[in-house]
Amino acid sequence: RPASYTGVDKDPVAAKHVRELVGTRGTVINADASDTGLESGAADVVVGEAMLTMQGEKSKKAIISEAVRLLAPGGRYAIHELAVQPDTIDEELHTQIRKDLARAIHVNARPLTCAQWSQLLEECGLVVDSVHTAPMALLDFSRNIRDEGFMQTLRIIRNVLSDRELRARVLGMRKTFRTYQQWMCGVAIVAHKPLKGEDHDAQ
């Protein structure tokens, strides 16, 4: 069990809300993930949840580099992101998925292949330890119940049904995810910051 937890959120309202939920069990700061202001080398583990997919290449690298700065040598960085598959996917199809996804969720999402995610982490100085994928189930009802609980899922559905604009957006997202379901997946990658003298290319 970690000695302490520190959460980082760029949205001050979200940071305040999580801070109230966490209470004395951890710390939550309002900061950018690419420039947290936290102490270098003080973290044993850094976790990024569905954050990098929504960033451009420059921002992706900035956030990962900040995670590397925060980690002590041997510390681990774990990410959970959206990926496209297979690694040999046609570039034209990959581009079309990115465009349609960005149009559906109103964010310039840029999912990578699993190989590209691993390469990005390695370019920032990390050693990839494991890569695991799972079917894309972001808007799957049964998955939502497992993740959020029955009552919370009902509240989400109520909010969606009562807001025409939100409803149209969610339905658009669902349609896009279903259209490209066979080429999209969730990916979880764990990498570590090399120890002094460790071969960066060692897997």
Question: Model features per residue range: what roles?
Answer:
Residues 1-36:
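Class I SAM-dependent methyltransferase SAM/SAH-binding core
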Residues 77-100:
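Conserved class I S-adenosyl-L-methionine
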Residues 4, 76, 127:
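Residues at the starts of beta-strands that form the adenosine-phosphate
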